């Protein structure tokens, strides 16, 4: 069975992204932060103070993600922190899956649809690259429809 990790690794390789490339890893970190801000934007809180904190966090983290994705800032995980980073990334997967489970979201199917949509970003096996190295979307590309999975 091909895992989501394997599909993502193959997709990045097809896009010309290489393990150990400082620029590629920095852009990927920026993309990861951008996705987290998208998650934060879905949250609602029952206090004005909490809403302000979430809004500030979205603004600040979104700003940082854009700086990183554009190449204005280069970030990296130093070797002595990689075990901690791996643990945090795995914990992020576990807690994200837990949220989906508790909200009765069909994460298995959603993962496959999102990965299929990413595959559709390749045109004749080649990526559309944006300035800064982020993978773009070809004309006519559509995001995965997840509306029936919630």
Regions found by a protein language model. Name each.
Residues 1-89, 93-150:
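Flexible "arm" and connector segments at domain edges
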